[in-house]
Regions:
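Glycan-binding loop/region signatures in secreted carbohydrate-active enzymes
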Residues: 6, 109-170, 237-263, 328-348
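Active-site-proximal helices and loops of the catalytic beta/alpha 8
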Residues: 2, 25-32, 38, 45-47, ...
Length: 440
């Protein structure tokens, strides 16, 4: 399915001294991103926000992508509309898809207060953006004439009422504009617990036009909750849909944090259900960090173990910008980091998953392969010494070679091994590390 890169982190323009230049900075990284094997970019919200220096999650003018002088200036914190268009076109030229971040639960930065006659409260619900598109007033927000509440609010920001016909149609039109005019290929839906899944389904059923052909947008939703809640949301959002949306696998992320940071974690727990990767792999977007969790609950130790897990297992893996570009986990030109794992994912990680062996300290998994992928063996070791076992694989009389590995203290390199005529082989992984073996 490919590998997604989250192409931002919180306050990245300020931290990297790229204020109003983030789009051009990403563009400068595109050759390296493409060469590494990434297939898609997830960009931060491109709309003009309530503040000039904002990450965009407080949307004011959806249609201002950095061209109207309002809320402090013309460009967004990431740059101008022209620079965004250039970034998208440059990414497409390299075969990369680009996903927009849609914040449809709430708005911010209203131009005037209004009295809502339904509850008698005054709120900042009058929006007259300079784009002159999707102007809003109290009738567009909760409580409205169509419903009083729809699931969740975000702070005290005005909460959009999607059952109001104007809001519903304007958001669909905006999504179509992003696909057809701006060039986005899909969406990440922010805070989907805040509004009905039917709204997402309505957008996903769009057939966007590009040139003389139509296409279905890719999408993933941020349902930050337990697997049961995510399941319920996926069922609602995808009911009768021929273009189902996926969801970020938050339950798996917490499990991977325990793997990396909790002393005594049993590798048996990796096989437990209750994560999308095992239960709904076709709709699972797996990740290790994102712009939210890294600020409050970061993974501190041995994070590459988590990346090895998501880049060898089923699901659509997403790599975090800081992990790749800032924190030295890419490790280009060797087999000990994310780059080698991306290559494994794209060349070998296909077909069903079989757990061949597991105990508290050793986990061995096999991907059976498919038409485009050869399959692999993933060995994860939680001991402080080399660890391995005999397993029966799908290959007989075949040489398996280590394609990616990592261990604490860089203690040695896994060896090439041959399966016997009965497909048995003994495979090992470095201390507190992993090894990925593929058929030669």
């Amino acid at each position: 399915m490919g590998v997604m890169l989250q192409a931002f982190y919180w306050d990245c323009p300020k931290i990297e001294n790229r204020e109003h230049q983030w789009w051009t900075y990403i563009k400068s990284k595109l050759p390296a991103i493409e060469q590494a094997g990434f297939t898609a970019l997830w960009l931060p919200p491109a709309n003009k926000a309530a503040g000039w220096k904002s990450m965009g999650y407080d949307p004011y003018d959806y249609y201002d992508l950095g061209e109207f002088d309002q809320k402090g200036g013309a460009p967004t914190w990431f740059g101008s509309k022209a620079e965004l268009l250039d970034l998208i076109q440059s990414a497409h030229a390299l075969g990369l898809q680009v996903y927009a971040d849609l914040v449809f639960n709430h708005n911010s930065g209203g131009d005037a207060q209004e009295l809502n006659p339904i509850d008698g409260q005054s709120r900042w619900t009058k929006f007259d953006p300079k784009s002159a598109k999707f102007t809003r007033d109290w009738k567009c927000f909760h409580p409205s004439q169509y419903e009083t509440w729809d699931g969740a609010t975000f702070g005290d920001m005005p909460d959009l009422c999607h059952r109001t016909p104007l809001v519903y149609t304007e958001l669909i039109n905006y999504a179509r504009w992003l696909l057809e005019e701006i060039g986005f290929d899909g969406f990440r839906y922010d805070m989907v617990k805040g509004y009905g899944g039917w709204m997402v389904r309505s957008i996903q059923e769009l057939r966007a036009l590009r040139g003389s052909s139509s296409f279905k947008p890719y999408a993933v939703g941020e349902c930050w909750d337990s697997e049961r809640t995510i399941d319920d949301w996926l069922d609602e959002a995808n009911a009768w849909s021929d273009n189902p949306v996926g969801a970020f696998d938050f339950p798996l992320r917490w499990r991977l944090r325990d793997l990396c940071d909790s002393y005594g974690f049993s590798l048996r727990d990796l096989t437990d259900r209750g994560v999308l990767m095992w239960d709904r792999s076709a709709q699972a977007v797996t990740f290790v960090e994102n712009h939210d969790v890294v600020r409050d609950s970061p993974i501190i130790n041995d994070k590459v173990l988590a990346y090895a897990f998501i880049l060898t297992h089923e699901g659509y893996p997403c790599v975090f910008w800081q992990d790749y570009f800032n924190w030295d986990l890419a490790q280009p030109n060797n087999q000990r980091g994310i780059d080698a794992l991306i290559k494994v994912h794209e060349q070998n990680a296909g077909g069903p998953t079989q757990v061949l062996y597991v105990n508290d300290d050793l986990y061995v998994m096999q991907r059976l392969g498919d038409g485009d992928h050869s399959g692999l063996i993933f060995v994860l070791n939680n001991r402080g010494t080399w660890n391995g076992t005999w397993i029966q694989t799908r290959w007989d009389n075949t040489r398996l070679v280590p394609a990616a590995w990592h261990g604490r203290d860089d203690s040695g390199v896994p060896e090439d091994k041959w399966t016997n005529e009965s497909s048995w082989i003994d495979l090992w992984a470095p201390p507190r590390g992993y090894a990925v073996y593929v058929p030669a």
